[in-house]
C-alpha cells in the first residue's frame, strides 16, 4: 500500500503538488507512481522560466522499466527545478514526497487547484487501476 500524504493534492496522472510559503507549488510524482516505474535512471526537467499549462507534459522520468511523461498539475511559470535529480535520479524512489521533487511552479490560475484530488480521491484512482 502506497503512502499518500493527506496535506498534498494529486492529479489522476500521479503527480502531487504542495503549496510553499512563497506561494509557489512544488510538484513531484507519487510513491505509487515511482513504485510502478521502478528504479529511476534519468530525469528530464523543464527549464526555469518555462510557461506550462495544466495537463502539459513538461518533464520525463526514465526508469529501468519505462519512460513516463510528467504533467503540470496547474498552469503557471516554472520557478525552480530540482537539479539534484540530474546526478541522483534515485531520490525519486527513496523520497518521492521530499528530496525527489521535480519542479516548482508559480500558478497563474489558483482555481485549477480545485480540479485536483485529495488523498482519498487519489486512493480511489489507484484502486481503479
Curated annotation (Swiss-Prot):
Q: Where does the record place the Lipoyl-binding domain?
A: 24-106
Entry keyword Transmembrane:
no
Q: Which residues carry this modification: N6-lipoyllysine?
A: 65
- In this UniProt entry, which cysteines form S-S bonds? none
* InterPro entries the record matches: 2-oxoA_DH_lipoyl-BS (IPR003016), Biotin_lipoyl (IPR000089), GCV_H (IPR002930), GCV_H/Fam206 (IPR033753), GCV_H_sub (IPR017453), Single_hybrid_motif (IPR011053)
GO BP, sorted A to Z = glycine decarboxylation via glycine cleavage system
List, alphabetically, the Pfam families matched: GCV_H
Q: Could you tell me what the cofactor note in this record states? A: Binds 1 lipoyl cofactor covalently.
The record's section on Gene3D superfamilies has: 2.40.50.100
Which cofactors are named for this entry? (R)-lipoate
* Cellular component terms per the entry's GO annotation: cytosol; glycine cleavage complex
Q: Which UniProt keywords apply?
A: Lipoyl
Record keyword DNA-binding present? no
State whether it acts alone or in a complex, and with which partners, per the record: The glycine cleavage system is composed of four proteins: P, T, L and H.
> What does this chain do?
The glycine cleavage system catalyzes the degradation of glycine. The H protein shuttles the methylamine group of glycine from the P protein to the T protein.
Please give the family membership noted in the entry.
Answer: Belongs to the GcvH family.
Spell out the protein name for this chain: Glycine cleavage system H protein
Amino acid at each position: 500500500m502506497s503512502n499518500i500524504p493527506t496535506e498534498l493534492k494529486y492529479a489522476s496522472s500521479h503527480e502531487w503538488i504542495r503549496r510553499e510559503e512563497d506561494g509557489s507549488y512544488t510538484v513531484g510524482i507519487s510513491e505509487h507512481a515511482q513504485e510502478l516505474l521502478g528504479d529511476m535512471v534519468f530525469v528530464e526537467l523543464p527549464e526555469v522560466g518555462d510557461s506550462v499549462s495544466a495537463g502539459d507534459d513538461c518533464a520525463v522520468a526514465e526508469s529501468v522499466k519505462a519512460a513516463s511523461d510528467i504533467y503540470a498539475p496547474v498552469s503557471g511559470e516554472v520557478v525552480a527545478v530540482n537539479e539534484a535529480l540530474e546526478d541522483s535520479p534515485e531520490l525519486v524512489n527513496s523520497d518521492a514526497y521530499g528530496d525527489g521533487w521535480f519542479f516548482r511552479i508559480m500558478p497563474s490560475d489558483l482555481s485549477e487547484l480545485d480540479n485536483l484530488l485529495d488523498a482519498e480521491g487519489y486512493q480511489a484512482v489507484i484502486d481503479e487501476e
